[in-house]
Each structure stands twice: as C-alpha cells, then as structure tokens.
C-alpha cells in the first residue's frame, strides 16, 4: 500500500506538532503513536508509515523551532491553537467503573473515636454523592471494634449522624460493627475448619522476626481440630490478654511482609463503651477482618479508600478468595493536605482536647466538621469543596481559602452587615448633635431596609485605624459623616464640609465605627479570640451569618443583654 499525499501531510503535521511542543526534533515513537491513534486507516500498513515517518522526521530535524511553527501554521493551524490551550485539571466525580443505576451500594465507615474531621468529610460527601448519582444505597457503618488504641466515644456516634443530617444525607442503613461479633466468630470458625486460619501463641516480637525471615511460626501447621479447641478457649476467656492471636494463613514467603499471615483476632479484656456490648466479648476482630466480612455481608459493590490502605485490600483478598467471594470494585485516592492544619489525626486531637489545649471538638481552631459548622461554613460549600477535589491517586494539597470562596458565594447575598470595633478607641466629634444614623443592612439588597444607631458626640474606632490617621486629615465614618482629625491624643475631630464625592476622588480613608453604648462582642476564630464593641442590633441575629464590615463573616453563636459571642468564618 502506497501512502497518499494526504497521508504524508498527516504524518508531517503530527511530527511538526511534536517538534513545536518540545522545541526539539520530533520523537518518532511518540509521533507514530499519535498517527496510529488518530488515523485508523493507516494501521493496516505500519511499515509504510514507519518508513515515511523516518524520512519526514529527518527532514524536520534540519530546521529550527521558528521554521517548524511557521510550517505547522500553514498546514494545520488548529494544532498550533491546541498547543496554546492550557488543559485544566479535571474536577468533580468521574463515573464509577462497572456501576449500574439502582444497583450501587457504597459505605462510609468511620471509627467513632471522635467526630468527623475535614479528612473524613471527603469520604462522607463523595460516597453519598456517588450513591445519589446512581440511585443506589448508602450505608453508614461504624467500625467500632477497637476497644483500646482507637477507643470509640459514645458522643461521636450521634455527632456523625448529626453531620450527615446537616449535609442533607439520610443513610439507607446505619450499622454498628460491634453488633456483629457472632457473625465474625462464625466466619473465623469456618476459616479454621478450612485450614485457612490458625491460633498463634508467639510473642509479637518473635512472630515478627520469623515473618521477616519468611519462616513459619511453630503453630502454623497445627490441625484444624486443635485450632478450634484453642479458638473456643480464646472465646471463653481462658487465655490472657495478647496471649493468643488468630491469624489468616496466607503466603509466608510473600514479597510483602505486611501480607504474611496477618492477625485477624486478638484478646483484649476490656469493656466497650456501648452498653449493649460492655464486657460481653474478650476476643476482638482487627479492622481488616471485620471490614472484609462487613463489606461482603452488606453487599458493597464499590469502595473508595485511601491509597495507604492498598495493603488492606490485599489482605482482605485472601478471605474473599477462600470463600469464593467477589471483591467490591475499589478506587484509591491520595492523601489530602490542608495548608492551614498540616498533619493531624483524631487521636492526636483527642489528646490535645483532654489536655485542655482546646475548649472542645468544636473549638474554632480545629479541623472538625463540628468546628467549621459552628463558624458558619455551609453544608453546600463543604460538599462542593470536597467534590471538586475529585477522586484520584494523586495527593491533594489545598487551602481553606478554596472552601471559604465557596462559602462566600452562599453567605454574601444573605448576610446582614454590622459594625464591630476591636481594640476600641474613643473618638470625640466637636459640635456633633445627637442623631440617629441610618445604615443599609445590605449594600445591594435595599429591600432589607436599614439599621438605626443612636449617636451622640462620641463613637468608637479601631486602634489600628487610629495609628494610620494624621492630624488635619479628612476621613469618612462609613455610611455616616465626614470628619477632620483635630487631635490625635486624645482623639478628636470636627465635622467636615468636604463632599462625599470629593473624598472618594481623593481616596480618603473610610473608617468603620461603633456607638459608645454598643454591646460587648467576643469573636472566636482560628487565630484566637478578639474582644470589642458592636452594634446592639447584632443580638437579633442569633445562629445567623452576618458580616462585620471590614472584618469578615461570622456566625452569631450566643447573645445576652450584655454580650454577644460570634465565631469567625472567613473574610
């Protein structure tokens, strides 16, 4: 088959595009792949294409980047344009592999050793959104079978349910893994009977030494009958803490030590915080075993988990293989690093709270869902923030500013405006008669009306504004009046006749202010607390988001006749 002039031109344009893109002679292998991918009709004669490509590449290599670009613009200007288009990273949720509408079953499985964090919020949002996308079933499963290292908190169960309610998600099922010990025990017996599990009495350090050397422990070849006897003794509490471990028999010579005869059950004579469980059990399933059984029993079709849990999937794969089950389709995603919080864990946060470093799980300095809710972050903003991260193996590094930007879109149109003055300094205005200032509740939505502030001859302004004032300068008290500074210490001023238009043209300083008889305001935020004075009208905004002008958006958390407590959301 002889290549047509059009075929040769096609090869040339893709070779030129490669040269222009990388500013060097075209790479034959890459160009060949491109040509074959874009031109199915040429796949029948790869030899002729390869020969022609070799000649064309040799000729192009004699030129320079400017000549390549000129020639490419002559024969295929659209390819020049394609090189100039910056490809945006994919955002949002990609289709799930093998997902069928109405048949998808997914779960979010937290350990309730504390409330949901921004880390767990990703799983809460993405799993529930996929289920919604495919009209499937969503399971909230509490993986609460660790009585020791990650001991459950009773309050955390309700906190997760409350967070899901806030997100607008109603799980189709709520499951407590700690209710299913009898099921786990039954499957353990079956594995023992099959010769796929055994009771190991090695000390931890001894087993590790053997495992690392790819050597079987002395108990590995114990008969199923004897293993069943030891298993029943474990359940009866006849062995001491950590005296015996039930192990899944895998490949003791596997190249990955983490997959060699991994532990499935251990003895811990401890109580469970749930009253229904209490001291009922002394043999506790480890997470890889319990999770494998749960995912099968609950009919999971798809799992999304961190790439750090790839080994868990491999360990669980042995159980699925032994029972002839099909493992759910699994997607792994990378870690998320939020700049403002760095690395954190629920366990470390719990210790810090118990040590008194934080006021509680909703302390505004913490990366918990409870904390950001209290600050005024809206559920829809968090959902969009998490969805736009997408699902991929690449680690994600992101700033809270992205979440704040989404939240700002939601709260800015609805938040009433008020003045809050921190570190207040008294400003006396000579000749000012008592009056009532009328200020807009919202700068663009005038249907909201105005807020009225009774003003005498004194107001409060921020100390940081005072530091920037100069004697004789004319400034505007926002939405009120123009004044001229006559003294810096004490701070005094007089009314100015300079027009508002002239002040705007001169870009004069605009200062927000508060009445001297305003209400005491405490703002709690990620950077610490601020005290000051605000308008009395703030007391009518309990549990609402407001904007303290020139300060930021805040949620009004508590009010009394003497004081307002607000939580800072963001600028």
From Swiss-Prot:
Q: Quick check: keyword Nucleotide-binding in the entry?
A: yes
**Enzyme Commission no:** 6.1.1.17
Compartment(s) of residence? Cytoplasm
Which Pfam families does the protein's record reference?
tRNA-synt_1c (PF00749), tRNA-synt_1c_C (PF03950)
Q: Which reaction does it catalyse?
A: tRNA(Glu) + L-glutamate + ATP = L-glutamyl-tRNA(Glu) + AMP + diphosphate
| UniProt keyword annotations, A-Z | Aminoacyl-tRNA synthetase, ATP-binding, Cytoplasm, Ligase, Nucleotide-binding, Protein biosynthesis
Q: Which HAMAP family match?
A: Glu_tRNA_synth_type2
What's this protein's name? Glutamate--tRNA ligase
- Organism lineage string: Archaea, Methanobacteriati, Methanobacteriota, Stenosarchaea group, Methanomicrobia
Q: Which gene encodes it?
A: gltX
